[in-house]
Amino acid sequence: MQKRRTFIHKLGEKRSSMKSLKYWFLVVDLGFTTYWLVTALHLLPDAYLYNDYTNPILVNWNWSFFPLDILVSITGLYSVYASRHGGRWQVFALISLVLTSVSGLQALSYWTLAGEFDLMWWIPNGLLLVYPLFYIPGIVQGLKEHH
């Protein structure tokens, strides 16, 4: 008897491969790395900075994301590397996806509490929050099948 496939199971099968995920990882992980380099070197024009960007508390808040974002980049880029070299990429991909979603959620939570709405900050952070949710079920399903 053939096992009945649900919509979620089919979605999980499609989202458990590195095929499309690697593009997301490359964009997000290289984007984070670029953002932090540009931020550290003060290369962004003032018009693109968040409100009160000179306030030391907000500067600290922004830099508090650095370890999280760099860990996202390291795990995401490593999972792409591991997938090409026969390694166990799924665990690192799952870590990267969860941390990416957390990073987006934390930023949006702050902007919500601050009562600030700027599409330039909301759109990318909304994508960081949501896009991993399409891949996490498939990665988890793939990990369950391997164990």
Model-derived segments and spans:
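Non-cytosolic membrane-interface motifs at loop->transmembrane helix junctions
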Residues: 51-58, 114-127
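Cytosolic juxtamembrane helix and N-cap/initiation of the first transmembrane helix
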Residues: 4-34, 57
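Juxtamembrane helix-break-helix junctions at the cytosolic face
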Residues: 74-94
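Hydrophobic alpha-helical membrane segments
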Residues: 69, 91-109, 125-133
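Hydrophobic transmembrane helix segments
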Residues: 28-71
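Membrane-water interface at the C-terminal end of transmembrane alpha helices
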Residues: 128-147
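Membrane-helix boundary connector in multi-pass membrane proteins
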Residues: 105-122, 138
